[in-house]
Amino acid sequence: MSGPVFVITGGSRGIGEAVALGAARQGYFVVLTYASNAERAASVVERIHASGGNAVAVQADTAEEADIQRVFTEADRHGRLGVLVYNSGVTGQHSTLIDADTSTIDRVLDVNLRGAILCGREAARRLSTRTGGAGGAIVFISSRAAFYGSPGEFVWYAASKGGMDSLTNGLARELGAEGVRVNAVSPGPIVTEMHRPGKLEVGAKRSPMQRAGTPDEVAATVLFLASSEASYVTGANLVVSGGL
């Protein structure tokens, strides 16, 4: 018998994949979203099923409200929502702001911030004791870029993550008395497909630990925040960056 439903957006690779696998091991019914790679998402679901867990994959563009509604409708089919982890994120092409095109900026803000807000709203509607929910947890995957600003690379991405940090803080205060904890995790250089060639190595050398992190190390932090072990933790932003 599966436990509560665990929604993880961007759950087909990297940090999202590690979170999905870990949540399934903890007994959650996992609803993971993917943008376009159905084969990769199916592979994650198959691994969960092979280990005795339960999961489904849903194609969704989290910049689209209709897709978000469809994800949560699917989650409702499988039981009571317990956790949302918003992991969807894009950077756009690297450049200075002077050279950036508006379509890139719009896309990054729509996926990284607007999508987080809309998914947070849908989760809150289901989790809040004020609306009949049983409480639960929301975890937003932010970035150390929000602190450093990513000059010369993608300041718009950093700004979108800064907005996510504000969302975390405000929503934690808004939902604190309604049984919902809201936190964020800010990864530093992590071994994922998001980084352009050479970028990860540069970040690893800057880290006091002299290495990049792994998706599993980030996932462990996410799963802690989603668990009862973090029952008195809300409004926090845990940095997983090797000291950066």
Where are these regions (language model features)?
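Residue(s) in the substrate-gating loop at a strand-loop-helix junction
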Residues: 143
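Conserved glycine-rich Rossmann-like NAD(P)H-binding loop of the short-chain dehydrogenase/reductase
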Residues: 26-43
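Substrate-binding pocket helix/loop in short-chain dehydrogenase/reductase
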Residues: 95-97, 101-109, 203
